[in-house]
Structure formats: structure tokens, C-alpha cells
């Protein structure tokens, strides 16, 4: 209401800048946490593949010993240790076979080890957001993403829950707060006066990004690789978010 009060204007602008930087820093921290999740998932997938390959190899050795009529106690202990280490990364179920081998499945039923063969997991980008990670398997020459519900328990399950629930909720809450506050502040700013002669309504002080509709990577594309269709979104009332 007193645009000529320059000292007050500078205080308000400084505090507004500080607030904007705080929102930006919070968003950057969420991005950093997400990058850490991706890196940890990649390491976990490599560890799982190493362990499942080890189980398949020991299965082969056990089958040979059992076939000769002997009991491979040391090999059984070695396999039990590998399964225990695997369980630290993902919840698994096991099924023994008559030949002494052990089949290993993730809790959702995906086969990891069957006899002397292991199925490798792979790190993949999320279908809707390439900055997020997902777990996949090779299926008929293509990567098939596993639902996170199949990977309950263990380090991988915890990382996926943190990514898909905690970080997603935190990012959404931060966006809602920023949009609602910016809208209200700009509305209040418009009720004031600027330094023009004659004075006019105050200009918006804050700006925030428009909402983004993320397309599935499997959506139809044209010959140039661009999505055929798109969706745009706007915020009609930020306070209702």
C-alpha cells in the first residue's frame, strides 16, 4: 500500500527471494535422494545377479554329487548362505527338486533360479518418469518391467517403496505448497500499488512451473519417434490442490 517505502520493498523482496531459494533447495534435495535410489538399485541388481548365478552354479555341483549317491553337505551349506544373502536384497521363496537343486522365486512368483539356470534382473527406467528406477527381466528378448509389488521385502523392496511412496509424496507436497503460496501471494500483491504514475496494481512476485502430464514410454509414436498424442494441464485453483 506504500510503494514509495523503498526499504520495506527491499525487505519484502529479500525475504521472497530467500523463500524461493528454500523451495528450490528442497526440490534439489529430493532430486539428489532420487539419484541415490537409482544408484543403489543398480548396485542391488548387480548383487542379486551375482548371487543367483552362484546358486545356479552350486545347484549344478550338488546335482552331480547327488547323482553319484553322495551327500554334498558343504555345497548345501554354501547354497544356504547364498540364499540368505539373496534374501537381504529381495524376499524369495525356494522349492527343492528331487535332483538336489533348489528353485528360487521372488515373492511375486518370478523365477530367479531353476535348476542350473538363473534369470538375470535388469535395471530399467520407470515407464512414466525416466529419472526413477524400476526392475525388469529379460523376456523373449525384451525387457519386461516387474511390478514393485512382486519385489516386496529386502533392500530392493525398501528402495522401491521409498522412491514410489515417500519421495513421490514429498515432491507432490512441496509442489502443492509452492503453488498455493505463490498464488495467494500474487493475489495479495495485485491488491497493492506499484511505483508507476499513476500507480497500478502490483505485478506477480512468484512464478511456479506448470503441471506436467507424464506420458508412458509405450505410447504410440510417429515415424520421427515423437508421441502422437499429448495432454496438457493447468491449475485453476492452487488452493484446492
Question: Where in this protein do the model-derived segments appear?
Answer:
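Structural signature of extracellular appendage/secretion-system components
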Residues: 1-241
Amino acid at each position: 500500500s506504500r510503494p514509495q517505502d523503498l526499504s520495506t520493498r527491499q525487505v519484502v523482496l529479500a525475504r521472497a527471494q530467500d523463500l524461493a531459494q528454500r523451495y528450490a533447495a528442497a526440490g534439489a534435495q529430493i532430486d539428489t535422494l532420487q539419484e541415490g535410489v537409482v544408484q543403489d538399485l543398480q548396485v542391488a541388481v548387480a548383487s542379486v545377479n551375482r548371487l543367483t548365478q552362484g546358486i545356479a552354479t552350486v545347484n549344478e555341483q550338488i546335482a552331480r554329487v547327488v547323482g553319484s549317491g553322495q551327500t554334498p553337505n558343504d555345497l548345501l551349506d554354501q547354497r544356504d548362505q547364498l540364499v540368505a544373502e539373496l534374501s537381504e536384497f529381495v524376499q524369495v521363496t525356494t522349492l527343492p527338486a528331487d535332483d538336489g537343486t533348489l528353485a528360487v522365486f521372488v515373492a511375486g512368483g518370478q523365477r530367479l533360479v531353476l535348476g542350473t539356470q538363473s534369470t538375470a534382473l535388469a535395471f530399467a527406467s520407470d515407464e512414466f518418469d525416466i529419472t526413477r528406477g524400476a526392475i525388469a527381466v529379460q523376456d523373449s528378448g525384451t525387457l519386461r518391467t516387474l511390478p514393485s509389488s512382486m519385489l516386496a521385502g529386502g533392500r530392493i523392496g525398501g528402495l522401491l517403496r521409498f522412491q514410489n511412496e515417500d519421495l513421490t509424496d514429498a515432491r507432490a507436497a512441496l509442489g502443492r505448497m509452492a503453488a498455493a503460496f505463490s498464488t495467494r501471494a500474487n493475489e495479495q500483491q495485485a491488491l497493492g500499488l506499484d511505483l508507476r504514475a499513476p500507480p497500478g496494481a502490483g505485478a506477480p512476485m512468484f512464478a511456479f512451473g506448470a503441471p506436467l502430464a507424464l506420458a508412458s514410454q509405450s505410447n504410440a509414436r510417429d515415424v520421427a519417434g515423437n508421441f502422437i498424442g499429448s495432454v496438457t494441464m493447468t491449475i485453476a485453483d492452487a488452493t484446492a490442490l
